[in-house]
Swiss-Prot record:
Biological role: Subunit of the V1 complex of vacuolar(H+)-ATPase (V-ATPase), a multisubunit enzyme composed of a peripheral complex (V1) that hydrolyzes ATP and a membrane integral complex (V0) that translocates protons. V-ATPase is responsible for acidifying and maintaining the pH of intracellular compartments and in some cell types, is targeted to the plasma membrane, where it is responsible for acidifying the extracellular environment.
Gene3D superfamilies, per database record: ATPase, V1 complex, subunit F (3.40.50.10580)
Assembly and oligomerization: V-ATPase is a heteromultimeric enzyme made up of two complexes: the ATP-hydrolytic V1 complex and the proton translocation V0 complex. The V1 complex consists of three catalytic AB heterodimers that form a heterohexamer, three peripheral stalks each consisting of EG heterodimers, one central rotor including subunits D and F, and the regulatory subunits C and H. The proton translocation complex V0 consists of the proton transport subunit a, a ring of proteolipid subunits c9c'', rotary subunit d, subunits e and f, and the accessory subunits VhaAC45 and ATP6AP2.
Protein name as it appears in the record: V-type proton ATPase subunit F
Domain of life: Eukaryota
Recorded family membership: Belongs to the V-ATPase F subunit family.
Keyword line: Hydrogen ion transport, Ion transport, Transport
GO cellular component annotations of the record: membrane; proton-transporting V-type ATPase, V1 domain
A GO MF label: proton-transporting ATPase activity, rotational mechanism
UniProt organism field: Anopheles gambiae
One Pfam short name: ATP-synt_F
Phylogenetic classification of the source organism: Eukaryota, Metazoa, Ecdysozoa, Arthropoda, Hexapoda
Gene expressing this chain: Vha14
Length: 127
């Protein structure tokens, strides 16, 4: 399945501040699809929460995106939308920004993943 995904050229998308987006764009993440839609959104102080929400909804509907990276401070603004996304792909990863460090206690995706595994089961299976 991973090989098929790689052959299709699945993308990573980014919703973040300018520094975050520029960093990923310099790393080669930036793409514009055949419909001329980019796989990134630069959020600034003038960006409405509804714009972030709409962008996230567009990204989860695109079949060429497998991973959505979003600055955690913006994820907090649209938490209800992120929490309603339960499909395995695209995977949503919350990342820190230059001005806002990552806080694992706010990451609902991480909390959901932790709930899937019982640490005691892992220890019992190692024997």
């Amino acid at each position: 399945m991973a090989l098929l995904s790689a052959m299709k050229g699945k993308l990573i998308s980014v919703i973040g501040d300018e520094d975050t987006c520029v960093g990923f764009l310099l790393g080669g993440v930036g793409e514009i699809n055949k419909n001329r839609h980019p796989n990134f959104m630069v959020v600034d102080k003038n960006t409405a929460v509804s714009e972030i929400e709409d962008c996230f909804k567009r990204f989860i509907k695109r079949d060429d995106i497998d991973i959505i990276l979003i600055n955690q401070n913006y994820a907090e603004l649209i938490r209800h939308v992120i929490d309603s996304h339960t499909a395995p792909t695209p995977a949503v990863l919350e990342i820190p920004s230059k001005d806002h460090p990552y806080d694992a206690s706010k990451d609902s995706i991480l909390r959901r993943a932790k709930g899937m595994f019982n640490p005691e089961d892992m220890i019992a299976n190692r024997g």
